[in-house]
Amino acid sequence: MNNNFQNNIFWQKHSITRLKREKKNGHKSIVLWFTGLSGSGKSTIANFLEEILFKNGINSYLLDGDNIRSGLCSDLSFSLADRNENIRRIGEVVKMMLHAGLIILVSVISPYRNQREMVRQMLGKKNFLEVFIDTPIEICESRDPKKLYKQARTGQISDFTGIQCTYETPNTPDVLLKGTDSLKNNSKKLIKILYNHNIISFINID
């Protein structure tokens, strides 16, 4: 970016602060960053959790990787540079949503550890919870809801994570969920995490 142009940009402070929004909402804001292979259950778990939050009057929003790539990041390929840019853009959007007082659920493969760490640093460690959906690739491939593994195996698509490209599992995720566990059990764990971090009041989903 042109330095002269950058020097003429000034951050506009909002009269309504994040703290005021959180107080009105009755809960704090945070990011749950769901990472895992395609077909691991990221979006399914995030959707199920969002339904619970919504029914309990908690303001949340789910950002799905495919949805973002269909609009905001439709100009990006799956090269390493573009994958990094994709994650950076998502991080910038999430940063604004944090200040809106929301609980943001991000479902995106984000295959590289440095990508996820970049977002953690961008948002601040206290605002970011890395949720690793640990599902064996054999199960992900057997599910294959979008038929992407099949296309990758036959060479119809390239640069597919888990086949042609590496997925780097988190060394120490904030939350570890088994993609083979039930939606209810995984959601209970996430609700407990949010409660233990003083983000929300306790929710009983039994």
From Swiss-Prot:
Domain of life of the source: Bacteria
A GO BP annotation: hydrogen sulfide biosynthetic process
Keywords: ATP-binding, Kinase, Nucleotide-binding, Phosphoprotein, Transferase
InterPro entries registered for this protein in UniProt: APS_kinase, P-loop_NTPase
EC identifiers of the protein: 2.7.1.25
Pathway where it operates: Sulfur metabolism; hydrogen sulfide biosynthesis; sulfite from sulfate: step 2/3
SUPFAM superfamilies: P-loop containing nucleoside triphosphate hydrolases
CDD domains xref list: APSK (cd02027)
Location of the active site: S110 (phosphoserine intermediate)
Example of a GO MF term: adenylylsulfate kinase activity
KW Transmembrane helix (keyword) present: no
Pfam families recorded: APS_kinase
Catalytic activity: adenosine 5'-phosphosulfate + ATP = 3'-phosphoadenylyl sulfate + ADP + H(+)
Endpoints of the signal sequence: none
Binding site for ATP: G36, L37, S38, G39, S40, G41, K42, S43
PANTHER family: ADENYLYL-SULFATE KINASE 1, CHLOROPLASTIC (PTHR11055:SF63), BIFUNCTIONAL 3'-PHOSPHOADENOSINE 5'-PHOSPHOSULFATE SYNTHASE (PTHR11055)
Protein purpose: Catalyzes the synthesis of activated sulfate.
Similarity remark: Belongs to the APS kinase family.
Protein name (record): Adenylyl-sulfate kinase
Native organism: Buchnera aphidicola subsp. Acyrthosiphon pisum (strain APS) (Acyrthosiphon pisum symbiotic bacterium)
Name of the gene encoding the protein in the UniProt record: cysC
